UniProtKB/Swiss-Prot annotation:
It comes from Acanthamoeba polyphaga mimivirus (APMV). WD repeats lie at residues 14-53, 58-97. Pfam families: WD40. Transmembrane segments: none annotated. This is Uncharacterized WD repeat-containing protein L84. Signal peptide: none annotated. InterPro entries: WD40/YVTN_repeat-like_dom_sf, WD40_repeat_CS, WD40_repeat_dom_sf, WD40_rpt.
Length: 132
């Protein structure tokens, strides 16, 4: 029964700011949240107890989207500053920055290797990300 106490854990996380985007790691062990003043920060949380593992300023303006790569190695963020940033998942270090674009959505597609679908309907292959 779902209401049984051993299955229900009530946990609250007080970020004190709006949340603009949320994604989960492919293994579902981590939750990644964009929040903070003007939603510029990224928080890595442990999914089991919501412990904050990392918190860092990611963009100069609000983050509009977060996505995890399918292999779980990277988190990709897009912000109103027009940048797409690629973060090493394990270290939270910045791995790469793509040139400014008007990004409203992002996704990774398994069938097409990996690519980002951005607002301008330009497909960027994963190889192109590392060449920029």
């Amino acid at each position: 029964m779902l209401t049984d106490r051993k299955f229900v854990v009530k946990t609250t996380l007080d970020l004190q700011d709006d949340i603009s985007s949320v994604c989960c790691s492919p293994c579902n062990r981590y939750i990644i949240i964009a929040s903070g003043n003007n939603c510029q920060h990224i928080y890595y949380l442990c999914a089991t107890n919501l412990e904050i593992l990392f918190k860092f300023k990611a963009h100069d303006d609000s983050i509009v989207h977060l996505v995890s790569t399918l292999d779980g190695k990277y988190i990709v963020s897009s912000g109103l500053d027009g940048l797409i940033k690629i973060w090493n998942f394990k270290t939270a270090n910045l791995a790469n920055v793509l040139p400014k674009r008007d990004v409203r959505r992002m996704k990774f597609d398994v069938m097409e290797n990996m690519w980002l679908d951005i607002a301008e309907s330009i497909d960027i292959s994963f190889d192109e990300i590392w060449q920029s």
